A protein has these predicted regions:
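Vicinal oxygen chelate
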Residues: 1-65, 91-126
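Mid-chain, well-packed structural core segment of small domains
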Residues: 69-97
Length: 126
């Protein structure tokens, strides 16, 4: 029987698996100040570096090939020590294969309960 989490308990991914909260990504169709363009992914990001809570805005170009769930539903992002290990250990449903949006970082998107979740591995930790 699956354990029901109480209101005062942290999610299992943090409490037991050791994942660390990194940011929340929110899709938008509005231009945001300080946008940075990621040409290989065809979208703009902003807000992350200024937000004390890790709020990141994402504005997608027409023709962006990322999964529509990523483009339309906010996602949580967690830092993990070994992205591929976590995916296989927990039998996670991958909706965007591991890729590198920048130097020293690998990300993948999974789906849980209809919502996208980003896993981030920083290669400097290796």
């Amino acid at each position: 029987m699956k354990k029901v989490r109480l209101e005062n308990e942290l999610p299992e991914s943090i409490e037991k698996w050791g994942w660390k909260y990194h940011h929340i990504g929110i899709p938008t169709d509005k231009f945001m100040p300080g946008e940075k363009y990621l040409p290989h992914l065809r979208f703009f990001v902003s807000g992350f570096s200024e937000s004390p809570f890790g709020i990141e805005w994402m504005r997608f170009e027409k023709g962006c090939t990322l999964n529509k769930l990523i483009q339309t539903v906010p996602h949580l992002a967690f830092e993990v020590a070994d992205l591929n290990y976590e995916i296989s250990l927990h039998n996670l449903k991958v909706i965007s294969e591991p890729n590198s949006p920048g130097d020293g970082i690998i990300v993948a998107m999974i789906e849980d309960n209809g919502a996208p979740v980003e896993l981030i591995e920083f290669l400097k930790n290796k």
